[in-house]
């Protein structure tokens, strides 16, 4: 039996989120609806999640001593990493000492904080199909890896980055240095290390949201959401939709891969598993042990969206991955580099049939920063995609004044 206390009282069930962007914000809202006291942590003030949490804290989450001091001061029962750039060895230490439970596990947070840990787990430990790859610490190593078998075209990504930052495709030798420089500019840490992957000529890519939650017998069960299709530009999601049709054999393979990876990572919660698909073939790409940006579409499509699934699973509550309606999401970009922007056209966006708009409340806009998302429902995915893109195009961020 799960017992939940009263927020802001001695009986409170306290959950701390490390990272409070738009995904964390929705997790915080889902937790609060279940009576949880929430603590939103980020590296800058007034992050989206901090605007809705009971408590807002700003620290350098990659600093182990700052992280340790905050957890010991706040005393949450659960710590939920929502980004990669965290001092995960400290989380492992605190979890091992019984100070706090990390979601899904501190080991999972460490392995997924960069592309190297999770790729080696999937390909080398679990033997799952992936693209051919090499890790490189210099421009010279990158060129050697490409010449030594990776070949062209190929994709270069920083070992640690998010939302496609620093990711590019190389079509020939003339693009290698530019790709290396772009990866160095887009990574989250100062030391330069990249993964170079052979390009897979896939038909489409999906996100398979995978939930590890307690069943009626108290044991962890694995459930899958309906596949989510998405379009990425330079590694960053621009639209997604659900359901995405798949050959039954490909779906079975995708679920096998997702189950293998998430079972090894362990714990409870929702995982976003990214996969490439060609016909009946499926390749593992990446996994995030938390809600996924492409999964924002589930706010339109599922009875329990990905954030509610994550909140329920980590609290030991039952979950349902049932689909409610076909739907789609489309990103609203900042368009300008400015603080405190204003948004025109929200009324026009909401006149598009069966649409919703989510503005994230980020204090600073950049031209390619995700500032909101349009959601749409329809009887079929194609109509939903058209509506979501139309609604997103209506919303125009601009400099205030």
From Swiss-Prot:
It catalyses: N(1)-(5-phospho-beta-D-ribosyl)glycinamide + formate + ATP = N(2)-formyl-N(1)-(5-phospho-beta-D-ribosyl)glycinamide + ADP + phosphate + H(+). Pfam families: ATP-grasp, PurT_C, RS_preATP-grasp-like. GO terms for cellular component: cytosol. Residues 120-315 form the ATP-grasp domain. It comes from the Bacteria. One of its GO terms (biological process) is 'de novo' IMP biosynthetic process. N(1)-(5-phospho-beta-D-ribosyl)glycinamide binds at residues 22-23, 82, 293, 362, 369-370. Pathway: Purine metabolism; IMP biosynthesis via de novo pathway; N(2)-formyl-N(1)-(5-phospho-D-ribosyl)glycinamide from N(1)-(5-phospho-D-ribosyl)glycinamide (formate route): step 1/1. It is an enzyme of class 6 (ligase). Mg(2+) binds at residues 274, 286. GO terms for molecular function: ATP binding; magnesium ion binding; phosphoribosylglycinamide formyltransferase 2 activity; phosphoribosylglycinamide formyltransferase activity. ATP binds at residues 115, 157, 162-167, 197-200, 205. Keywords: ATP-binding, Ligase, Magnesium, Metal-binding, Nucleotide-binding, Purine biosynthesis. Its EC number is 6.3.1.21. SUPFAM superfamilies: Glutathione synthetase ATP-binding domain-like (SSF56059), PreATP-grasp domain (SSF52440), Rudiment single hybrid motif (SSF51246). Gene3D superfamilies: 3.40.50.20, ATP-grasp fold, A domain, ATP-grasp fold, B domain. The keyword DNA repair does not apply. The keyword Acetylation does not apply. PANTHER family: FORMATE-DEPENDENT PHOSPHORIBOSYLGLYCINAMIDE FORMYLTRANSFERASE. Involved in the de novo purine biosynthesis. Catalyzes the transfer of formate to 5-phospho-ribosyl-glycinamide (GAR), producing 5-phospho-ribosyl-N-formylglycinamide (FGAR). Formate is provided by PurU via hydrolysis of 10-formyl-tetrahydrofolate. Belongs to the PurK/PurT family. Homodimer. This is Formate-dependent phosphoribosylglycinamide formyltransferase. It comes from Cupriavidus pinatubonensis (strain JMP 134 / LMG 1197) (Cupriavidus necator (strain JMP 134)).
């Amino acid at each position: 039996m799960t017992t939940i206390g009263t927020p802001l009282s001695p009986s409170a069930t306290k959950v701390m989120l490390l990272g409070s962007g738009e995904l964390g914000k929705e997790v915080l809202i889902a937790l609060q609806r279940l009576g949880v006291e929430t603590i939103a942590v980020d590296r800058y003030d007034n992050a989206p999640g901090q605007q809705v949490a009971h408590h807002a804290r700003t620290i350098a989450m990659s600093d182990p001593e700052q992280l340790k001091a905050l957890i010991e001061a706040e005393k949450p029962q659960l710590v939920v990493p929502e980004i990669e750039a965290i001092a995960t060895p400290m989380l492992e230490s605190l979890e091992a000492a019984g100070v706090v439970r990390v979601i899904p596990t501190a080991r999972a947070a460490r392995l997924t904080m960069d592309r190297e840990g999770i790729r080696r787990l999937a390909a080398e430990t679990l033997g799952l199909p992936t693209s051919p790859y090499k890790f490189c610490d210099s421009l010279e190593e990158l060129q050697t890896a490409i010449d030594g078998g990776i070949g062209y075209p190929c994709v270069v990504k920083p070992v640690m980055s998010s939302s496609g930052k620093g990711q590019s495709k190389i079509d020939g030798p003339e693009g290698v240095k530019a790709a290396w420089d772009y990866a160095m500019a887009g990574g989250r840490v100062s030391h330069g290390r990249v993964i170079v992957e052979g390009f897979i000529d896939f038909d489409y890519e999906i996100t398979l949201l995978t939930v590890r939650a307690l069943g009626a017998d108290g044991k962890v069960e694995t459930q899958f959401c309906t596949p989510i299709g998405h379009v990425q530009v330079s590694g960053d999601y621009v639209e997604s939709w659900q359901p995405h049709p798949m050959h039954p054999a490909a779906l079975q393979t995708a679920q096998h891969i997702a189950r293998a990876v998430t079972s090894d990572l362990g714990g409870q919660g929702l995982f976003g598993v990214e996969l490439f698909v060609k016909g009946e073939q499926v390749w593992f790409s990446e996994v995030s042990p938390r809600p996924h940006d492409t999964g924002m579409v589930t706010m339109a499509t599922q009875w329990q969206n990905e954030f509610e699934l994550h909140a329920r699973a980590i609290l030991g509550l039952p979950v349902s991955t049932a689909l409610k309606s076909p739907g789609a999401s489309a990103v609203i970009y900042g368009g300008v580099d400015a603080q405190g922007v204003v948004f025109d056209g929200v009324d026009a966006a909401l006149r598009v049939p069966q649409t919703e708009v989510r503005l994230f409340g980020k204090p600073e806009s950049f031209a390619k920063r995700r500032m909101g998302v349009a959601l749409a429902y329809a009887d079929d995915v194609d109509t939903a995609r058209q509506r979501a893109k139309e609604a997103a195009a209506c919303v125009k961020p601009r400099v205030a004044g």
